[in-house]
């Protein structure tokens, strides 16, 4: 399970990094920082560094430590993003974050794909819990 999660995370970060060169002036970056089982931070800012700094501050303010608040994902431009809650049998949970999508429907499809083999990976829950647009507006389910 952990290997697949890391592979998907690396793939998402790699694909989002490839889009960096296509950044349009004025578009914002997004960063998601997570301290597993403690806290997280999500920020949309003018550039990636500012978004990361802001998200780390939020994570720490929420109870995470500087050591545990790790960057989960960044995208510039941010596009549409989705926060996916994953919970393993036995209770541990974490969030997978996918960003940089050109349309909200694509972000939701990314969540669907991430959860497509959830039971095979020992997950008892896998669901999109937030959809974020490029301006940082957060929408919670249902996403209709």
Language model features with spans:
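N-terminal signal peptide c-region/cleavage motif recognized by signal peptidases
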Residues: 16-19
């Amino acid at each position: 399970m952990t290997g697949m999660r890391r592979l998907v995370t690396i793939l998402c970060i790699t694909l989002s990094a490839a889009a960096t060169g296509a950044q349009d002036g004025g578009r914002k970056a997004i960063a998601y920082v997570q301290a597993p089982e403690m806290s997280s931070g999500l920020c949309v800012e003018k550039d990636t560094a500012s978004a990361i700094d802001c998200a780390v501050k939020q994570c720490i303010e929420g109870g995470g430590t500087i050591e545990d608040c790790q960057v989960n994902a960044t995208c510039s431009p941010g596009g549409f993003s989705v926060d996916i809650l994953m919970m393993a049998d036995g209770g541990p949970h974490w969030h997978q974050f996918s960003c940089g999508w050109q349309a909200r429907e694509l972000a939701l499809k990314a969540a669907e794909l991430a959860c497509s083999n959830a039971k095979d990976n020992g997950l008892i829950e896998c669901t999109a819990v937030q959809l974020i647009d490029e301006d940082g507006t957060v929408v919670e389910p249902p996403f209709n």
